[in-house]
């Protein structure tokens, strides 16, 4: 597929994949993007998932017009992008492999070969001239692996962005970018906001007209929109006004409290996203918890702790540096409710977390006193 006169798309899509990275549901499949620049010298950018190696090499061959590549540029070593490096090297024996020093160490671990006789090690600011096109390499460590680099092509103002600006879904899926890009970001990159911010600062110094990520669609217009969202996400800012309610309920009493709270909040005209953690896709609940500025957690005391799905959810937030949010708590316990205390303690190392003064404490079923507490909590969480 032609991107520009000299830049072509040679990636593939897995439309049958159910779980990306073994945990993220991908109902629209997954794209593994790869690119080639055709110039005096030919550079290929990244490979694809192992099971698509032959299809990818065919895509490449169809764009080469009988020529052979001079370089394979490896921006990211995660196996969904690097699995076919050795296969490429076997087919194109004269091609040089270009990547960071850390990436070559990973190649030794994955393939038993650092390609010492045919490698070019690059670092921040290094350049690779292809003829009309020149690549400048930019370090992007921990976005989201330590070896990551991105590449800027100056003549056509292209940023080859590795996993940054990626999203779930096959390449040709027509869907709102932000939804699945947000879920991808907070699921996979979210822990590394500082590092993503560092990359954005470097990108701000470049004149970029197109962003070419390793997952999802090419970003070719209105780049300020995408850059703005990435800035909000990576700085742990609030994207939209609203409240996320995440809950678990054993016999329906905690769920009843959640429904009452949702009604009270919606009366004020505020958006509410509700997730039953035992049944929902956890990554969507995590996405909403970061999208909105307010979060209510509702669960039962369980084995002198909290219900396992809630524990997992809180862990998913805190390990991604959840911060700058207001949290409300609802607990339920038939004889010794301790869930609120445990949930509050789980955020003790999180930055800029404000807890609502009212904690709804249910002992068994929702009482009239609880209903009054719920009305108070609704006012506090949106205030």
Show the residue positions of the predicted features.
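Metallo-beta-lactamase
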Residues: 2-5, 99-148, 192-198
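Active-site neighborhood of phospho(di)ester-bond hydrolases with catalytic His/Asp-centered motifs
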Residues: 45-47, 69-77, 97-100, 159-163, ...
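Active-site-proximal loop/helix segment associated with metal-binding centers of metalloenzymes
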Residues: 144, 148, 164-191, 234-239
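Active-site metal-binding motif and surrounding structural segment of the metallo-beta-lactamase
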Residues: 51-98
């Amino acid at each position: 597929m032609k991107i520009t006169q000299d830049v072509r798309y040679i990636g593939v899509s897995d439309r049958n994949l159910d779980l990306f990275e073994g945990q993220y549901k991908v109902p629209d499949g997954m794209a593994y993007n790869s690119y080639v620049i055709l110039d005096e010298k030919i550079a290929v950018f990244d490979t694809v998932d192992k099971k698509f190696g032959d299809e990818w090499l065919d895509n490449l061959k169809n764009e080469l017009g009988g020529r052979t590549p001079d370089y394979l540029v490896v921006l990211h070593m995660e196996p969904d992008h690097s699995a076919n490096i050795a296969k490429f090297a076997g087919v194109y024996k004269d091609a040089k492999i270009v990547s960071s020093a850390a990436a070559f160490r990973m190649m030794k671990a994955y393939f038993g070969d650092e390609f010492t006789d045919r490698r070019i090690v690059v670092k921040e600011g290094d350049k690779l001239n292809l003829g009309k096109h020149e690549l400048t390499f930019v370090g992007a460590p921990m976005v989201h692996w330590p070896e990551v680099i991105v590449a800027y092509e100056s003549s056509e103002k292209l940023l080859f962005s590795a996993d940054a600006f990626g999203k779930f879904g096959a390449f040709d899926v027509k869907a709102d970018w932000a939804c699945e890009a947000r879920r991808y970001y907070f699921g996979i990159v979210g822990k590394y906001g500082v590092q993503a911010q560092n990359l954005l600062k470097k990108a701000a110094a470049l004149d970029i007209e197109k962003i070419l990520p390793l997952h999802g669609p090419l970003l070719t217009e209105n780049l300020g929109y995408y850059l703005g969202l990435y800035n909000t996400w990576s700085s742990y800012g609030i994207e939209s006004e609203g409240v996320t309610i995440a809950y678990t309920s054993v016999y329906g009493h905690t769920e009843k409290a959640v429904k009452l709270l949702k009604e009270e909040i919606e009366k004020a005209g505020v958006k509410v996203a509700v997730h039953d953690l035992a049944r929902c896709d956890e990554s969507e609940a995590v996405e909403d918890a970061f999208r909105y500025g307010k979060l209510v957690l509702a669960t039962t005391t369980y084995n002198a702790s909290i219900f396992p799905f809630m524990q997992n959810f809180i862990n998913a937030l805190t390990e991604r540096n959840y911060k700058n949010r207001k949290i409300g708590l609802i607990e339920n316990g038939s004889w010794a409710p301790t869930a609120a205390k445990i949930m509050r303690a789980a955020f003790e190392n999180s930055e800029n977390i404000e807890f609502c003064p009212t904690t709804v404490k249910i002992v068994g079923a929702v009482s009239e006193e609880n209903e009054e507490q719920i009305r108070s909590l609704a006012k506090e969480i949106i205030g």
